[in-house]
Amino acid sequence: MTATSGARTSDARTSGARTSDAGIGSPAAIELVGVAKDYQTRGRAVPAVSRVDLAIRPGEFFSLLGPSGCGKSTTLRMIAGFEEPTRGRILLQGRDVTAVPPNRRDVNLVFQSYALFPHLDVAGNVAFGLRRRGVKGRELRERVGAMLDLVELSELADRRPRELSGGQQQRVALARALVNRPAALLLDEPLGALDLKLRQTMQIQLKAIQREVGITFLYVTHDQGEALTMSDRIAVMNGGRVEQLASPRDIYERPRTRFVAGFIGTSNLLRRTVRALDAAGPGGRPTVVLDAGTDERLSAPLHPPTGPLRAGDQVELTVRPEKIEMSVSRPDGPGCALRGRIVEVVYLGTYTTYTVATHGGTEITVFWQNSTGAGNVAERGDEIWLSWLPEHSYVLPEPVALPEPVALPGSVVPPETVNQPDSVGPPDSIIPPHSVVAPDSVDPRETVVPAAGTSADPAAYRISH
């Protein structure tokens, strides 16, 4: 489903801190200043989003990533104008649009449900918004043709939606949202209904299209692979807050919090006690040395925002499974080394997963690339050594209780669940004019909204003045 509601940037760091790096004289495409959203339930305020400060650069592919209930879709709907912030301001291209209705915001929104008009062919669906704006004749044909070329659907211009695959329908919805040249495009899990192979293909195509048109894309997803594949930057959300904002590589390689380390990819978390601090560790970087067994070694460089540490402090060391090597003898050198016994072996094609129980009682996962096809390097029950470079591990402060995902009490559906696969899309009254609308004769000054309980069929839509 496409909808209408724009702006240009900055940077937000851990826990919602805000900095601006859009460049002198260049406003953020989308900027949130202290934005919060509470829902009133049984006479009390339930926070769904808690003070988000965020700035998205012009032409950036930016993702909001997090589990269901973290507030990412609620944040997106506030930007689109479908939800009103309880506190804070929303700016699009430097203009405060907090109180501006969705149809007055220069952004378009693509939902997981594409809501293509079944009585119109592909070209008609793409042209619909242009016709609503009074574009006619040669300009209409050229703009529709260019957009169909962009999404590689020119040869299917005369087909109806029912004659298209899921991926083709998704591209029609994308073309319909882009043809009006919005300042920014908001996408709420648009690939969620596609199968795995098609979803992976569409990720590459979507990023290529974004790069070609140069429009700011704000993408909401719970899928780490989607965010890592397509994004220039990612904001990881949890409990209504931004836990970390960084590039995909930094999010994966240098998580700032225990939640990010556990949510992004697979991480091994080892709780240990600080034995000593080395001000000049490997590479001259400050290093923390942790307690380990006889002949074992554990250390990691210190990164902000770890904070000051002292001997005896409890910390967690995190290391990714693919960074770990296995050997039958104790490895030489200054790297990390632990002994263990293999308790599980799972063959997954491109790699094999080994679960290793260390002598300290912690289970560690190892991903071993199957590059030679020679079979397993070790078997269940084998005693082995695990090793990795200290710079491949990361020290996190002692874990604290993590906030639970926000869910409204009682039978109320949490805001985040609205556009999941078994959902019906946004509430009835929030579809802006030149997105999901009725036949071409409708006056462009009129707002078209679906009648309660109806499908995406334009015949079921009514006019609201």
Swiss-Prot record:
Region feature (Disordered): 1-21
Q: Where does ATP bind?
A: G66, P67, S68, G69, C70, G71, K72, S73
Entry EC no(s): 7.6.2.11
Compositional bias ranges of the Polar residues kind: 1-18
Q: How does it sit in the membrane?
A: Peripheral membrane protein
User: Which UniProt keywords are listed?
Assistant: ATP-binding, Cell membrane, Membrane, Nucleotide-binding, Translocase, Transport
- Catalysis performed (reactions): ATP + H2O + polyamine-[polyamine-binding protein]Side 1 = ADP + phosphate + polyamineSide 2 + [polyamine-binding protein]Side 1
GO CC annotation, single: ATP-binding cassette (ABC) transporter complex
Ranges for domain ABC transporter = 30-264
Specify the superkingdom. Bacteria
Enzyme class, top EC level, equals translocase
The cross-references to Pfam families, in alphabetical order and at most eight, read: ABC_tran, TOBE_2
One GO MF term attached to the UniProt entry: ATP hydrolysis activity
Which compartments does it reside in? Cell membrane
- Record's function text: Part of the ABC transporter complex PotABCD involved in spermidine/putrescine import. Responsible for energy coupling to the transport system.
The subunit structure is:
The complex is composed of two ATP-binding proteins (PotA), two transmembrane proteins (PotB and PotC) and a solute-binding protein (PotD).
Family membership noted in the UniProt record:
Belongs to the ABC transporter superfamily. Spermidine/putrescine importer (TC 3.A.1.11.1) family.
- This chain's protein is named Spermidine/putrescine import ATP-binding protein PotA
**Organism of provenance:** Frankia alni (strain DSM 45986 / CECT 9034 / ACN14a)
